[in-house]
Amino acid sequence: MAIICSFSKLLFVAICLFGHMSLSYCDFSIVGYSQDDLTSTERLIQLFNSWMLKHNKNYKNVDEKLYRFEIFKDNLKYIDERNKMINGYWLGLNEFSDLSNDEFKEKYVGSLPEDYTNQPYDEEFVNEDIVDLPESVDWRAKGAVTPVKHQGYCESCWAFSTVATVEGINKIKTGNLVELSEQELVDCDKQSYGCNRGYQSTSLQYVAQNGIHLRAKYPYIAKQQTCRANQVGGPKVKTNGVGRVQSNNEGSLLNAIAHQPVSVVVESAGRDFQNYKGGIFEGSCGTKVDHAVTAVGYGKSGGKGYILIKNSWGPGWGENGYIRIRRASGNSPGVCGVYRSSYYPIKN
């Protein structure tokens, strides 16, 4: 057994050293691999090397690289098997493909505070009537959405979701699209917990009470530090309050999205969500929500309704950083719990 393992390691090292000579063999299709890549260990290693270059991955030694390669193979096997089973959406390689699902959850998902559904707000949006709604809404097309960001190794999804909604309503009300500071919320919203979870509502309340600086003036560093809001100069964007959308109701959420981007929560810990590449997602998730994102539109494709979601895992995940989640009619938590807890900023 030791001889076989040593030989495998030598083969791995050899191909890693010389694999760059044949990277052209790797076909990065829409899912990041081709069926030919699954035919031999050599092809898999070449694919892994190509993937490493694409995502700027570096490992401290050969042992770590071999360990990550084994996880990469397992994820690739899962992706390929699931793509043969599911319809309507598909999985693919992304920057998380060298992480086990447990590692992915630890680094990027975490959980929401237990009392996340019981937070203060100034008004509740209740409108179940979907008859007069626009057939589709996409706030990106209206210039109210900034580029997709990456939260890094910091459970600050709540801050990214809040900032995206404030950026959106500020554009709608003033005509100006500016990038705002997630780091200010991580540092200064004392009702939340920095890189260890937080609240949509209290961060929106912070913006209403204090305003929020531009991202360029208070840049993101993916770790909590002492609040510097009083030392940062330049303009601030301010809102007037916090609104909550009626829970577990499709109509109310669609109506709210038709007016502005909305902060929502989803369950994102599953392997399908980790490896999502495109299509209308409707599979393998429950409603135990653990991740805040931003609803920036809705629509239909192929007869299926969806909510358009902006995530904070960078543009390499999903559909250039977005996911379309299947709509569920009536009173329910929705697919992945997307109807469970939704908030938005009020700006006069």
Curated annotation (Swiss-Prot):
Propeptide regions on this chain: 19-132
InterPro entries: Papain-like_cys_pep_sf (IPR038765), Pept_asp_AS (IPR025661), Pept_cys_AS (IPR000169), Pept_his_AS (IPR025660), Peptidase_C1A (IPR013128), Peptidase_C1A_C (IPR000668), Peptidase_C1A_papain-like (IPR039417), Prot_inhib_I29 (IPR013201)
PROSITE patterns per UniProt: THIOL_PROTEASE_ASN, THIOL_PROTEASE_CYS, THIOL_PROTEASE_HIS
Keyword Hydrolase: yes
Disulphide-bonded residues: C154-C195, C188-C227, C285-C336
Regulation of its activity: Not inhibited by cystatin.
Gene Ontology MF terms: cysteine-type peptidase activity
EC id: 3.4.22.25
Catalysed reactions, semicolon-separated: Preferential cleavage: Gly-|-Xaa, in proteins and in small molecule substrates
Biological-process GO terms, alphabetical: proteolysis
Signal sequence extent: 1-18
Domain of life: Eukaryota
SMART domains named among the record's database cross-references: Inhibitor_I29 (SM00848), Pept_C1 (SM00645)
Keywords tagged on the record: Disulfide bond, Hydrolase, Protease, Signal, Thiol protease, Zymogen
Active-site residues, as the UniProt record annotates them: C157, H291, N311
Protein's job: Thiol protease with a substrate specificity very different from the other thiol proteases.
Family according to the record: Belongs to the peptidase C1 family.
Additional note from the record: Substitution of the conserved Gly residue by Glu-155 could possibly explain the unusual specificity.
Protein name: Papaya proteinase 4
Species annotation: Carica papaya
